[in-house]
Amino acid sequence: MAKPTRKRRVKKNIESGIAHIHATFNNTIVMITDVHGNAIAWSSAGALGFKGSRKSTPFAAQMASEAAAKSAQEHGLKSVEVTVKGPGSGRESAIRALAAAGLEVTAIRDVTPVPHNGARPPKRRRV
């Protein structure tokens, strides 16, 4: 039986893009796209092997950001605009990690969705 051939990842030569950081209370997802929104690279705290409450730490967000940046730089990415969504603890550390990985951060935008009094929020936790 013939061996299945793996699809080779095509190197995209993209100079600038957008880094979308989705920081929830439980996880941090970093996705780097081109200016049209087509994904170049992504990473998350959970994908790197962090489990449970460790996923929501700033260190996990930093590692996810570094992994996504390293993968995007292989496609020739040099500068990014950053959009941050969500209330998570990994917001600042993810942005710092992108800059430390060698990507030039040109703009930081907060796109956290704020309801105009929409659905009822979940009840308060009593710990």
UniProtKB/Swiss-Prot annotation:
Q: What does this protein do?
A: Located on the platform of the 30S subunit, it bridges several disparate RNA helices of the 16S rRNA. Forms part of the Shine-Dalgarno cleft in the 70S ribosome.
Which species is listed as the source?
Streptococcus sanguinis (strain SK36)
PROSITE patterns from the UniProt entry: RIBOSOMAL_S11
The UniProt entry, under SUPFAM superfamilies, shows:
Translational machinery components
- Which terms are listed as keywords in the entry? Ribonucleoprotein, Ribosomal protein, RNA-binding, rRNA-binding
The protein's name in its UniProt record: Small ribosomal subunit protein uS11
GO-annotated cellular components: ribonucleoprotein complex; ribosome
Entry's family note: Belongs to the universal ribosomal protein uS11 family.
- Which taxonomic lineage is given here? Bacteria, Bacillati, Bacillota, Bacilli, Lactobacillales
